[in-house]
UniProtKB/Swiss-Prot annotation:
The lineage of its organism: Bacteria, Pseudomonadati, Pseudomonadota, Gammaproteobacteria, Vibrionales. Binds 2 [4Fe-4S] clusters. Binds 1 [4Fe-4S] cluster coordinated with 3 cysteines and an exchangeable S-adenosyl-L-methionine and 1 [4Fe-4S] cluster coordinated with 3 cysteines and the GTP-derived substrate. It holds the Pfam family Fer4_12. It catalyses: GTP + AH2 + S-adenosyl-L-methionine = (8S)-3',8-cyclo-7,8-dihydroguanosine 5'-triphosphate + 5'-deoxyadenosine + L-methionine + A + H(+). Monomer and homodimer. This is GTP 3',8-cyclase. Belongs to the radical SAM superfamily. MoaA family. InterPro entries: Aldolase_TIM (IPR013785), Elp3/MiaA/NifB-like_rSAM (IPR006638), MoaA (IPR013483), MoaA_twitch (IPR010505), MoCo_biosynth_MoaA/MoaC (IPR050105), rSAM (IPR007197). It comes from the Bacteria. S-adenosyl-L-methionine binds at residues 35, 77, 128, 199. Catalyzes the cyclization of GTP to (8S)-3',8-cyclo-7,8-dihydroguanosine 5'-triphosphate. The gene is moaA. Its cofactor is [4Fe-4S] cluster. It comes from Vibrio vulnificus (strain CMCP6). Its EC number is 4.1.99.22. GTP binds at residues 22, 73, 104, 165, 267-269.
Amino acid sequence: MERCSVAQQFEDRFHRKFYYLRLSVTDVCNFKCTYCLPDGYQPSGQKNSSFLNLSEIRRVVKAFADCGTSKVRITGGEPSLRKDFTDIIHTVASTQGIKRVATTTNGYRMEKHIGEWKEAGLNQINVSVDSLDPRMFHQITGENKFHQVMSGIDRAFEVGFEQVKVNVVLMKDLNHNELPAFLHWIKHRPIQLRFIELMQTGEMDTLFQQHHVSGVAIRNHLIANGWLLKVKAANDGPAQVFVHPDYQGEIGLIMPYEKDFCASCNRLRVSAKGKLHLCLFGDRGVELRDLLQQDDQESDLIARIQSELQTKSVSHFLNEGQTGMTPHLASIGG
């Protein structure tokens, strides 16, 4: 079976190299976040067995690893709802060439299971905490689980995680004024806060118009108060990360509406049903699943991905109001 050579590393026509795979393993979620699934998860009518199985996951991750991908983020939906989630982590972590295995979770199962996830090979975790006010957290997520999630973060440090990343979706009139509370929280904790601008998707146009707020004000505040921009690694995400000598924690800003946001794009997405998505806001998904059934299909799988990469756009078109085919962020893993 042919591996990619260095010259065949996944690369698009704009010479962007792809070191980072976001792999969704389910679109099911048990939270009802206002910016994602405000009415809760609505089953498609298909059985959950239609999601990628362990063998398919192993094959797609190996193909990406053989073509230069070194980081995999396991996403959802809520990925920990998969009964075989720990096995998925182990499968990804056991793949030659994969150096970092991450997941994004709502945190509700962390306190109980984070130890086994770490033992299986998980070495980076992102937890969604959209407010430090338990009542606002409940309002945004639809679940009264604030203290449970916070206990999960504490437990992550107890089992040996050196840093936990915390995602906060910025929303005007809901949580955009909580910066002082968040700064106080991370002063003596190795937490990287990641403020994410609300993004427009097919089903969330009204919410976007009501609650979108730019991260520029936060960035200006940080710079004015002595925070410094940190240099990125090749497989890091799109966050602008700021550090301060008086803070153990860090602040990241993800601002997709900013000019040149896509210039350093380094990630591709595979959905829980086995479709390749070149962009979170692309207008189509490319079927890969038919090439995930046998180990000897890897060269054909790689060829299909390489071919599709040449159609990847230079940028999304969010500023023109084009949100692509993504109905909500849970559908292809955010």
